[in-house]
């Protein structure tokens, strides 16, 4: 480079080659689907198109995510900011204990489903916050509220094997499953199941700025 700049002559140089391997290959993928260590299902009104759409987007962002030993998983960092530009729609959310409408309504049902699946799998909960009022899709105290500029849901993998998140939605239900290798010695926890009974829809105030879905 120096000769080229000072003398106008071309020069050649050899760059060392270093192999870069993916963290996840087909062999690891097969291994991690051997044992289900956690799962949870919640239910929602599929006739609420906007909320269902938001749930679908969040579920797709979570599906097939890996968390390696000692790693922490952040719900907010995985999904990113929920904006209209990313396809999220206005739907009912909880704001300071009241029902309102905002972009990304329904996302907290996904984070709450993930929390219960993760807790059942015996993973370490690092950060979790509850809504300011009970939500209908999980038992009291079993929710995990999230907001881009506010609460996050974070967990850590304390095991000596990676874990795989599988997430699905459709037909009015959201299911999240946690898988790992057959050799994993996990410590599962008892977690109460969600009710299949759906609440009645309620009117919402659209003039709200700070939202927590």
Model-flagged regions — what are they?
Residues 2-213:
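Well-ordered beta-sheet/strand-loop patches within structured domains
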């Amino acid at each position: 480079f120096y000769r080229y700049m000072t003398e106008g002559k071309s020069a050649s140089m050899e760059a060392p080659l270093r192999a870069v391997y993916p963290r996840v290959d087909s062999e690891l993928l097969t291994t991690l689907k051997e044992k289900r260590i956690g799962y949870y299902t919640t239910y929602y009104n599929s006739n609420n198109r906007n909320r269902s759409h938001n749930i679908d987007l969040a579920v797709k962002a979570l599906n097939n995510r890996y968390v390696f030993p000692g790693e922490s998983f952040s719900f907010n960092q995985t999904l990113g900011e929920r904006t209209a530009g990313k396809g999220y729609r206005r739907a009912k959310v909880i704001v300071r204990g009241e029902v309102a409408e905002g972009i990304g309504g329904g996302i907290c049902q996904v984070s709450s489903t993930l929390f219960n699946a993760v807790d059942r799998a015996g993973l370490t909960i690092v950060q979790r916050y509850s809504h300011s009022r009970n939500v209908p899709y999980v038992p009291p105290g079993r929710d995990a509220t999230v907001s881009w500029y506010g609460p996050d849901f974070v967990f850590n993998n304390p095991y000596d094997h990676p874990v795989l998140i599988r997430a699905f939605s459709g037909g009015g239900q959201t299911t999240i499953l946690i898988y790992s290798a057959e050799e994993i010695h996990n410590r599962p926890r008892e977690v109460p199941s969600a009710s299949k009974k759906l609440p009645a829809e309620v009117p919402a105030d659209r003039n709200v700025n700070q939202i927590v879905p």
